[in-house]
């Protein structure tokens, strides 16, 4: 039976990005695109919230989706995501992303091997554990969660400057309060059953890209992707080894035989 299952040498890979608001996602996504482009992979980028333009025709937003100013756009998009999760379930945005992967896949080639070979899907971004759980259930070991780290102060500064630029304002300091509020909502919407929970899923990542690290993002991404393809020339860093020991210790505390 197993002899009839054809092995795919370069299978499709699915990357789901988790980034707190204010962390610059574009640099990390571009690094993944560059790596897989060099590997000869077809790279398809899917932005989760792009589906809002279609969904709002059938499910009218309680708050109309704003295009500008930027801080208002973020707030209305967050509210609509909460509304969709309340109407369906907390994994709804992951489900729509999976549907879009299926649609893209069918346009790639004529044979099953072409459908499932040498394609990297970069899907951004997710905010709930239920979304990640669904993606792992569907794609198994072909799915990788990528979290993007940037310290809070840097995110507030980055976001306030974006708000100022969007409003064509000369100073960004008066936008810092709006940036702080939005970052808090994004991390954990206390009191909102179907709100965003980035802080709850961030550390479950298969890879954390550190925007504040001295090593550039391209090198971090290349190292991770080489490990995916089984490179045996890369040793764990001291930090990675420490994380492994901490994880192993945590698992031992859950051992029912103890």
Residue spans for each PLM region:
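ATP-dependent NMP and nucleoside kinases share a basic, alpha-helical "lid"
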Residues: 122-164
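Short glycine-/polar-rich loops that comprise or flank the Walker A/P-loop
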Residues: 12, 41-43, 139-144, 204-206
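ATP-dependent small-molecule kinase phosphotransfer cores
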Residues: 37-121, 125-127, 131-133
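Phosphate/oxyanion-binding active-site loops and adjacent basic polyanion-contact surfaces
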Residues: 24-25, 82-99, 217, 235-242
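Extreme N-terminal, non-catalytic leader segments
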Residues: 1-16, 37-42
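Small-molecule kinase domains that catalyze NTP-dependent phosphoryl transfer to phosphate-bearing small molecules
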Residues: 131, 149-151, 161-223, 250
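Short, basic/aromatic recognition patches
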Residues: 234-258
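Glycine-rich phosphate-binding P-loop
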Residues: 16-34
């Amino acid at each position: 039976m197993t002899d009839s299952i054809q092995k795919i040498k370069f299978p499709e890979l699915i990357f789901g990005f988790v980034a707190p608001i204010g962390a610059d996602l574009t640099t990390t996504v571009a690094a993944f695109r560059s790596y897989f482009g060099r590997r000869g992979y077809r790279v398809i980028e899917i932005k989760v919230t792009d589906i809002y333009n279609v969904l709002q025709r059938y499910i009218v937003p309680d708050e109309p989706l704003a295009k500008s100013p930027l801080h208002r756009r973020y707030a209305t998009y967050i509210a609509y995501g909460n509304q969709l999760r309340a109407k369906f379930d907390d994994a709804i945005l992951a489900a729509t992303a999976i549907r879009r992967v299926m649609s893209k896949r069918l346009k790639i080639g004529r044979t099953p091997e072409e459908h499932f070979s040498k394609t990297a899907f970069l899907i951004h971004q997710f905010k709930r554990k239920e979304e990640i759980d669904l993606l792992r259930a569907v794609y198994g070991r072909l799915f990788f969660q990528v979290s993007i780290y940037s310290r809070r102060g840097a995110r507030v500064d980055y976001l306030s400057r974006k708000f100022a630029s969007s409003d064509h304002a000369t100073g960004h300091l008066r936008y810092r309060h709006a940036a702080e509020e939005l970052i808090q909502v994004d991390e954990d919407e206390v009191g909102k059953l179907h709100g965003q929970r980035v802080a709850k899923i961030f550390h479950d990542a298969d890879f954390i890209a550190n925007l504040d690290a001295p090593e550039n993002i391209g090198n971090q991404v290349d190292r991770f992707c080489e490990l995916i393809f089984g490179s045996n020339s890369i040793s764990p860093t001291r930090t990675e080894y420490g994380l492994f020991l901490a994880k192993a210790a945590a698992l031992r505390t859950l051992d029912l035989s103890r």
